[in-house]
Design a protein with these regions (language model features):
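Extracytoplasmic beta-rich repeat domains
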Residues: 91-110, 138-157, 183-199, 222-244, ...
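C-terminal motif of bacterial Sec signal peptides marking the signal peptidase cleavage site
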Residues: 6-9
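WD40 beta-propeller blade core
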Residues: 126, 173, 213, 258, ...
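Blade/loop signatures of beta-propeller domains
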Residues: 29-47, 54-90
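Short loop/turn segments that connect beta-strands within beta-propeller blades
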Residues: 129-132, 176-179, 216-220, 262-265, ...
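Bacterial signal peptide processing site
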Residues: 11-14
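Structural signature of WD-repeat beta-propellers
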Residues: 120, 167, 207-208, 252-253, ...
Length: 430
């Protein structure tokens, strides 16, 4: 974000060339007719009457026993989860090192087998009782001779009885989820600020040099790599791939979404989330959000100003919207929910992307989410607010103060919500 600000500030205080009058310039003749802007601004989004007229159909809520990937599942899609109408704080616990000037806490907690797993900004993995918050174990992943300040970023995933962690130290670690014992460590040569997705005994993640890696979950041996377009300036957003039917879909900092064959890493199709005609400062950094695979369709959005729906198997574009977001879309029933960088929460028709309803969330702080549970869309904000929004009509039905900043989306498992605050406080709510 600082890059966009600094570029915008270069000309402050100087007159623009267009403001200097040319005495020899002839008056321009304006042609008749309606003038339609070529570049659609984020503010031009509005509710489509035909889409709004159709009632939103939510699938019945289902209780998920676990949340094993950063996006909930390997496809980053969980549908409609079970949760009570109101949430109340049950317990809170300190999980380690929070955000600081050295790095941000960005790893989403996981839930499985009665435990909540966290990775703090210092590179320490810990497990806590989901029932009480009591610590079960903790393991530092900081290599010897490291200062301990480069381990921020990375994330966790669970698959085939193993817990996997990526770290800013450029390592991937296999861990026993019951004891915290390290099973193996694999060096990848570059820091890994993003989270992994584990599926079918394989681990997929993107390192800071825009390389997608596939490792064997049993021993950490590299199976294949695929290089994306390097991007020197990024938002350091923490995303993870989506795994579907024979393909893994990865998001790269330059704004590219690429589908690869999970067997050999060959690219099947490629899409860009950057608006080529974008002139706003926000479009300079194109970091995408976590992609979602649902019903044979890939949904993706990014900071470059574009949201797309494409066929998972062929990459055929189904629809496009001009929309700027760093948050993973949530797909359920016939609707896709997404919040943009200005705090507009939208319900889009899954078939064509038309806006069914739009709600401006309160305040000016950044919002993270949504997660659909108990008929509501749940989001947390950088100023410490938790809101519940009716998924059918967009009305804000509940607001809770968490008392601390939050930059990580909520997690729901076993009918309980878990929120990891920026100061490394884990909060459980029923």
């Amino acid at each position: 974000m600082s890059l966009a600000v600094s570029l915008g500030g270069c000309a402050s205080g100087l007159p623009s060339l267009s403001s200097i009058k040319n005495p020899f310039k002839k008056a321009e003749e304006k042609l008749p007719g309606e003038r339609i802007p070529v570049i659609l601004d984020q503010a031009s989004d509005s509710v489509d009457p035909s889409a709004a007229a159709k009632p939103i159909s939510l699938p019945p809520p289902a209780t998920n026993a676990s949340w094993t990937e950063p996006g909930g599942s390997a496809s980053n899609s969980l549908g409609h989860l079970a949760l009570g109408d109101r949430v109340n704080k049950v317990w809170r616990v300190d999980v380690g090192t929070g955000s600081s000037s050295s790095g941000r806490l960005s790893a989403i907690p996981l839930v499985a087998d009665g435990k909540v797993y966290t990775l703090d900004a210092g590179g320490t993995v810990a497990a806590f009782s989901a029932a009480s918050g009591a610590k079960q174990w903790s393991t530092s992943l900081t290599p010897k001779n490291e200062k301990g300040v480069e381990g921020f970023g990375g994330g966790l995933s669970l698959d085939t009885g193993r817990l996997y962690a990526t770290t800013g130290y450029g390592t991937v670690v296999g861990i026993n989820p019951e004891s915290g014992a390290v099973l193996w460590t694999q060096k990848v040569g570059e820091p890994v600020r993003s989270s992994p997705t584990a599926s079918g005994g394989k681990i997929y993640f993107v390192s800071s040099d825009s390389v997608l890696h596939c490792l064997d979950g049993a021993d950490g041996q590299e199976q294949w790599t695929a290089r994306g377009v390097p991007e020197p300036a990024t938002l350091l957003s923490n995303v993870s791939p989506a795994v579907g039917k024979g393909l893994v879909v990865a998001a790269f900092p330059a704004g590219d979404i690429v589908a690869y064959n999970i067997g050999n890493g060959e690219a099947a199709w490629r899409e860009s989330l950057s608006r080529t005609s974008e002139t706003s400062a926000a479009g300079i950094l194109a970091d995408p959000a976590r992609p979602v695979i649902e019903g044979g369709v890939v949904y993706a959005v990014g900071h470059g100003g574009k949201m797309i729906a494409v066929s998972e198997s062929t990459g055929e574009r189904l629809w496009t919207r001009n929309l700027t977001s760093t948050q993973m879309p949530w797909v359920a029933g016939d609707t896709v929910y997404v919040v943009d960088i200005t705090g507009k929460l939208m319900a889009l028709a899954k078939g064509d992307g038309k806006v069914r309803w739009l709600t401006q969330l309160p305040g000016t702080a950044r919002w993270n989410g949504p997660v659909l549970a108990g008929g509501k869309l749940w989001l947390v904000s950088a100023d410490g607010s938790l809101v519940g929004v009716d998924a059918r009509n967009g009305q804000v039905s509940s607001t809770t103060s968490l008392g601390t900043k939050v930059f990580v989306s909520p997690v729901v498992a076993g009918g309980r919500m878990y929120i990891l605050a920026d100061n490394a406080t884990l909060i459980a709510l029923n």
